[in-house]
């Protein structure tokens, strides 16, 4: 007999006997086993303690409501859009140029062609808040204080808040401030003036007011060639007429043809014309009769 099978049969017999004892209630309990004590591995000497990762701090927000990470780009885009609007408006007699050092500062000049301030050339600077367009309205300060009811006689600042008490984004624009600065020289307003003397003279003694306006225009014209108050490569400056420089530039401006006119002349229109040259009446050409 195979010893393996003999061992298996004996073990079966022993197992059956143990089961019978269990059924009869004679149960022997085995002593509890003592589990070995668990120990953590030792920590290396140069190891850093493991700390819980901190949650990322919320992105800081700038005063204009945009995230600080892209706030400067948003401001730059807004100012670029504003300057594009100024160019498209083509404000008569008003020229502006953003500063080289800061997009929040624009240099400008206003030419007055008729009215009480005729022949006036007034240079100014526009200061834009750093939280534009959610802050206050831009400030406009003339380089030389102009004698005007709405211009501070000391600082030269124009009362812009009169027209823009609360600056509304997407509704108010910088070109409107420039248009307002031009309009105040053609339509005089004396209510709540920054220069009370100018307001009183305009209401009580218009001749004396005109005399002081003429003097103010002469002062601005005499100091037109002064160096800009703010040192900046893009600051607007004037120089006396130089024929070797300005004659050529003037000739180019006067002889420059519009692109539309050049395009119309280059396009050849084929077909018959029934309009006599120099006439706008159709069928004005005289028909030539052939003698038979």
UniProtKB/Swiss-Prot annotation:
Membrane topology according to the record: Peripheral membrane protein
One GO cellular component, as annotated: plasma membrane
Composition bias type Polar residues, residue spans: 1-11
Chain positions covered by the region annotation Disordered: 1-63
A Pfam match: UQ_con
Source species, domain of life: Eukaryota
SMART domains: UBCc
Role description: Component of the FTS/Hook/FHIP complex (FHF complex). The FHF complex may function to promote vesicle trafficking and/or fusion via the homotypic vesicular protein sorting complex (the HOPS complex). Regulates apoptosis by enhancing phosphorylation and activation of AKT1. Increases release of TNFSF6 via the AKT1/GSK3B/NFATC1 signaling cascade. FHF complex promotes the distribution of AP-4 complex to the perinuclear area of the cell.
Complexes and interactors: Component of the FTS/Hook/FHIP complex (FHF complex), composed of AKTIP/FTS, FHIP1B, and one or more members of the Hook family of proteins HOOK1, HOOK2, and HOOK3. Interacts directly with HOOK1, HOOK2 and HOOK3. The FHF complex associates with the homotypic vesicular sorting complex (the HOPS complex). Also interacts with AKT1. May interact with FHIP1A.
Protein's recorded name: AKT-interacting protein
Organism name: Homo sapiens
